Amino acid sequence: SKKLLSITDIVVADAFFSTSTFEKGMSELGFYIVSRFRDNACLHYIPKKEKRRGRPRVKGDKIDLANLNLSCMEELHIDGLDGKAYTLKAYAKALKKTVRLVIWRMPGGKCKLFFSTKLSMTGEEVLKTYRTRFQIEFCYRDSKQFTGLMDCQARHKRQLDFAFNASFASLNAAKVFIKDNGMDNSMAKVKSLMFNANYTKLIFDMSRCRPNRTLISKIVKELIGWQPKAA
């Protein structure tokens, strides 16, 4: 945990881990959580401070997602986000503590609830941080499908490390290729492009001729891009 804390003190997890047991364990290790509540989560507004004796109230009225009290929250303006998003500090019954809550009302009217146990984070930071979880999952998904992450049958640690690193390195190289050439972010298209380019090169190599590249450049490009166009 000390090595991880030197990098970041935030752990991003999906809604399955939005429980007091997981949050308490992470808190004891020094980590904050950025996650998502289930749609039926019980949340309360933070009550205003009252000048009276006794213990102050921890939670106020329950948050009704169908009838939000906009005076208790701040609207977020995020480029590219469909619908509307609001942020506020709220009491979460599942975690038994106050969190930084982001309510995203999608165009269809359905709400998604994102939160962070680090109260100093802004609502925009919570959403951006949670979105990084998908980028990590996409790396594993694409590596499994296209760069052989699960294909290695070795049993030694060093051999497995090499195979895993080679898989992720190939994926990163493909993403750099996509970015440099202004292509759609699709590994399937890149794989088809590489296969067709290699197959075209193999045909010319087997024929043992050196064609005029200037004359056939257009034809080669059509051959290479034939499969994506046909799909």
Please identify what each model-predicted range represents.
Residues 18-23, 123:
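Short, well-ordered alpha-helical microsegments
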